[in-house]
Regions:
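Nucleotide-activated donor-dependent transferases that construct or modify glycoconjugates
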Residues: 1-12, 235
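Active-site and donor-binding regions of nucleotide-sugar-utilizing enzymes
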Residues: 18-24, 64-181
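Catalytic donor nucleotide-activated moiety binding site of glycosyltransferases and closely related
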Residues: 84-102, 234, 252-287
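Donor nucleotide-activated moiety binding/catalytic core segment of transferases
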Residues: 111-115, 263-318
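Leloir-type glycosyltransferase catalytic cores
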Residues: 172-219, 330-429
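Active-site donor-nucleotide binding/catalytic segment of nucleotide-sugar enzymes
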Residues: 217-275, 351-352, 356, 364
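Extracellular carbohydrate recognition and processing domains
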Residues: 444-467, 501-512
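Short beta-strand-plus-loop segments that form exposed binding edges in beta-rich domains
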Residues: 474-481, 533-534
Length: 544
């Protein structure tokens, strides 16, 4: 039997935990587990139910359910007045979070112990196998779990999430602490000591296995020389108490260090969406996907951002000055460093350390993990899961030739032949604007992405498909807002009249597109589009 705990451990109100509460409530129903959470969530359950949308089920990968289905889940609630009292005594939310991460709290420990005692009395023949905890657990709960000899499994989304376009959601989870590399480092050393005899997959293969459809064309520029020296990936909050209480480090330290070595023109910055919301800055002018931004710089630095994993995946230099993530011990500490993450570790981290969504909340899986399987056994179980779930070619287990494996992986995803050939050629002898690195085109309702090559200051989009076209919709910016105009379009070598699209117009994020008029096509469609781009700021300045 497992217990699932959902508590508010950040600078958010308790209501913000409602999504995780509902997700865990469903897992508890399906597995016969017990849930511990805030009293507030129980009191406001009807309101929470009313706010449920199909988007919630999609984002958190849950099946739809109604209140009647989960009413018999055994739940225990921490009184709101207790947290309110402790926070009032501390004087601020920051000091409260520091206290919860630094050490114990007698009042909370008494409540946690009382709940565990009640559970043990109610289930005398069912030992508590473990406690799942969303995000880093408070020290009072850790203290009580340790006294009762119950392991805590802390978990958080990794940088790879299926609702964001990746092929699987992977979780970072372990029996120790989420935001340090101690347990991961031990697992890595064990893995190295084992006779694994496993194939190593290249960066581009790993992207072909896990990556988004929209970013596959960017593989073609992975080996290109970046334009900038360093990217700074900002956190959602100015201070992260669970980090600062141990490392005494935050984003301000990163900016301070970067200013010593780099000019502003050598740096790029990407803020967390939570930070943008707090500053009332629209997310529309920030790309949903950061891959092109990552590729634009030689290295990336962060305090604690999971996005650092994407830098390693895209073969850029990840810099983590402090021990704040599971893989930080393998990252450079120096923001001027040139060392990339070794490929064998990247394979280990993706296939062995991170846990696929379908296994993350499986009691059978975690009971198996508690039998201390070898790291190689964990790696193989995860890899077998991906082969089945993602319909990967089993030849990737034995085929020694990397280009052959890579081509097979692309085919298994349903990539079109032109894209496969482009990526196999591995050419990158052209200029690119990382702000408009790729565009999307929909032909007969199916989306395709290609790079935009810069020639004489104009972006050129080219695609060849082995099918006739009944409809063509062109999304120049795709996942970011801005302004665009068409310079010229041809289909199968025949010019298309785009005079109506010759002026700059605003392109909303995601939905902004041109529906193109075109001549009838045969059994093959070749599309060439030349277009210009202006940021919203440039457009407004030009028309002010």
């Amino acid at each position: 039997m497992f217990i699932s705990v959902v508590l508010n451990t950040e600078y958010m109100d308790i209501a913000s935990r409602s999504k995780w509460y509902l997700k865990n409530l469903l897992h508890c129903k399906e597995n016969g587990w017990i849930l511990i959470t805030h009293e507030y969530l129980w009191k406001h359950f009807e309101e929470i139910q009313q706010d449920i949308t199909p988007r919630l089920f999609y984002d958190f990968e849950m099946r739809p359910f109604k209140a009647e289905e989960v009413k018999d889940v055994e739940q225990y609630f921490i009184p709101d007045r207790l947290f309110e009292m402790i926070e009032k005594q501390c004087g601020s939310r920051t000091e409260f979070l520091f206290e919860m991460t630094r050490g114990g709290n007698p009042e909370l420990e008494t409540v946690f112990q009382g709940i565990l005692d009640t559970i043990k009395k109610s289930h005398p023949n069912e030992p508590i196998d473990g406690i799942f905890h969303c995000l880093e657990g408070f020290e009072p709960l850790r203290n009580v779990a340790k006294v009762n000899d119950i392991p805590i499994i802390s978990y958080v989304f990794s940088a790879l999430r299926k609702p964001h376009g990746y092929r699987q959601t992977l979780y970072s989870a372990n029996f120790g602490r989420l935001y340090c590399g101690d347990e991961c480092e031990k697992k890595w050393h064990r893995f190295q000591s084992e006779d694994t005899q496993l194939l190593l997959y290249s960066n581009r293969e790993l992207i072909a296995i896990f990556g988004k459809d929209r970013t596959l064309p960017l593989i073609d520029i992975m080996a290109a020389s970046p334009k900038y020296e360093i990217n700074v990936c900002g956190e959602g909050f100015d201070i992260l108490p669970h980090i600062f209480s141990r490392a005494e480090y935050c984003d301000e330290d990163i900016y301070y260090e970067c200013a010593k070595y780099y000019k502003r023109s050598q740096m790029r910055n990407r803020q967390h969406p939570i930070h943008l919301d707090a500053l009332q800055i629209s997310r529309d002018e920030v790309h949903n996907d950061p891959a092109a931004w990552i590729l634009s710089s030689k290295r990336m630095v962060a305090t604690c951002s999971q996005m650092i994993l994407k830098a390693a995946l895209w073969n850029r230099i990840p810099v983590m000055p402090k021990n704040t993530l599971p893989f930080s011990f393998m990252c450079s500490k120096d923001i001027t460093d040139e060392n990339k993450v070794p490929l064998d570790f990247l394979n280990f981290y993706l296939f062995c350390y991170l846990i696929p969504n379908d296994l993350m909340f499986s009691g059978e899986y975690w009971q198996w993990r508690m039998t201390n399987p070898t790291e190689t056994e964990i790696y193989k179980r995860h890899l077998d899961f991906y082969i089945e779930k993602l319909n990967l070619p089993k030849s990737i287990l034995t085929e020694q030739d990397e280009p052959t494996r890579f081509k097979s992986l692309l085919k298994s995803r349903g990539c079109d032949e032109e894209l496969i050939n482009i990526l196999l050629e591995d050419k990158h002898d052209f200029d690119i604007d990382y702000n408009t690195a790729s565009s999307r085109i929909m032909v007969n309702g199916k989306s395709y992405w290609r790079l935009n090559k810069i020639e004489n200051g104009v972006r050129h989009f080219h695609i060849e498909l082995s099918e006739s076209a009944d409809t063509i919709d062109f999304y120049p910016l795709d996942d970011v807002a801005g302004c665009a105009r068409l310079v010229s379009v041809s289909v199968n070598g025949k010019p298309v009249d785009v005079s109506n699209f010759a002026d700059f117009r605003y392109m909303p994020k995601v939905s902004g597109h041109y529906t193109l008029p075109f001549p009838p096509t045969a059994d093959k469609t070749i599309i060439d589009i030349a277009w210009d781009y202006q940021s919203n700021k440039e457009f407004l300045n030009a028309h002010s």
